[in-house]
């Protein structure tokens, strides 16, 4: 039996972010819809060719998406909210954009659907909306069209479908007490229709993704797998039931009773034993072993992968693949021309990971030919050399980390005592207005950074120019009447990458882009060694901004857990220790900001929830060290220094005790798309500290009206005492234009002023 290689998905953005540029050009009216569609077709053809050249046996189709693959699935199932529908009931790419971002070149602006994190990754998906009695039908046929494209090019393909149970799990019911699982019977006929269309095209295998199977699911959801995968989806192409991001051993009793033809298991994030899987799964099933890490950039230890799988060779049909979609990996290491050659030898990006699968397949298919095993050893040799590299180990960091005590994580006084001191210091009005940190990253700002890196300008010119942008941001905020200001973060390319550039233990790529959501891409830093701070990072900019105004200016830090979660971490050190190292480095930054006269310091932790293990039984351990890392970072602050934190894309009802334990003086959160429903949790738990619920959605170009914001603030005031309410957008304003920013913030400030006057009148 020949071992085959495949991946669960290929990055869709293009080597040079062609998809991002095409979409934004289309949104801005610079290219036509047909030109946009042509770009997508060219990218898909290029990606298939790259995979074929890398030696993969089967190529995925259906991994391409214009905004998000979950949103694509919604359109395929005709699950389009009424507010987003075209007048004639049809769906097209503009429908997709209205759902995802609230705006498209055609149709009217409308509230976008919610966006949240894809399991515990830094990728975002658009949350499907479900209603009572909802019907489904085959809508957008992008998948079928892409299958036809790939077949016409002569490729051996494996279409991808997001499975019906996971699709329902990932969505949200719009009515209270409505069980979205009840829609399964209405959903399955559409899946049958899709599978029939694929079978008609001669498709042998379909990858049907059911990542929800790695979770600790309620009984009803477990039982639903029998309904979906016994008879309903049979009689078409063979189904590869695909799981990722964790182990599936706890659900093997369910999986083995389903009428599928193979199982893919993530053997990187999960701890499933391949021998147990082999003994447990039906003998006629394919076992697809996800042994190449789809979520990190490190070169694989191929000899250990070979050892892990060799006993299965000849025992059953075996495929080797990526642990998950390579959506989460940069595309090609070979174009990184400035990276230290030693460090570069430690990595593998998407193209290189495909090659790793080919090398592993070659060795497994030729067990008797030792030269192929020698090739594996030669390939992985740089990983073993890394173990003694001076770029990895810092004894002083290790000593400092080992000396951490419980006292390092405790503020001097309780919040109720601190807040009185802080209110006396800052003398802010009720409903104080602020922003989350960043202001628009204009072409001029991005050009400055590019010119500095290319040597076209010197550091002095760059600093003066950044100071001018900071001055503009302060002037704009003063003119708008905001109460607590920010310096605007003109010097920052990305909230994580910027800090990584100024900390020892990180390295950076030129083109290591991955998709975050829609057209937004990020270039995560890579943690290669022990972390320390050689000198202050943000103090110079914060001090300058504060010198321009009498109003308080926030110092802006990215928290240790977020830096960890949004970087590619090292694989030879546990996450708790890495987070502690980052926290200690940023702790020193808090001290220096205070010494520079900065009285409000925001430590953003938007990734706190996404770092949660997928299995609830492992949450306590993670939350303990994650909260400790935040407190280790923040607790050094004086009592009259106000610590803020920001979290977005989060649901807090099941981690509220940990949010309270963080002991931030003020927390700002994303709530506008959920219409302030998130605040019910804060009321239920009697959240004791100040809170700023986001009053408008910065991910959409739509401008909120004063009345919209007032309505949201009134809802918030019913849940949170008004003396503890702050007024702010959902998130940073980096991706918005100045025109959008001025209009939205002006309406936000005016809304706050109106409610202040009402409150003063009611008190008089």
Curated annotation (Swiss-Prot):
L-homocysteine binds at residues 436-438, 489, 604. The keyword Signal does not apply. GO terms for molecular function: 5-methyltetrahydropteroyltriglutamate-homocysteine S-methyltransferase activity; zinc ion binding. It catalyses: 5-methyltetrahydropteroyltri-L-glutamate + L-homocysteine = tetrahydropteroyltri-L-glutamate + L-methionine. GO terms for biological process: methionine biosynthetic process; methylation. It is an enzyme of class 2 (transferase). The active site is at 699 (proton donor). Its cofactor is Zn(2+). L-methionine binds at residues 436-438, 489, 604. Gene3D superfamilies: 3.20.20.210. Zn(2+) binds at residues 646, 648, 670, 731. Binds 1 zinc ion per subunit. Pathway: Amino-acid biosynthesis; L-methionine biosynthesis via de novo pathway; L-methionine from L-homocysteine (MetE route): step 1/1. 5-methyltetrahydropteroyltri-L-glutamate binds at residues 17-20, 117, 520-521, 566, 610. Keywords: Amino-acid biosynthesis, Metal-binding, Methionine biosynthesis, Methyltransferase, Repeat, Transferase, Zinc. Its EC number is 2.1.1.14. InterPro entries: Cbl-indep_Met_Synth_N, Cobalamin-indep_Met_synthase, Met_Synth_C/arc, UROD/MetE-like_sf. Catalyzes the transfer of a methyl group from 5-methyltetrahydrofolate to homocysteine resulting in methionine formation. NCBIfam families: met_syn_B12ind, PRK05222.1. Belongs to the vitamin-B12 independent methionine synthase family. This is 5-methyltetrahydropteroyltriglutamate--homocysteine methyltransferase.
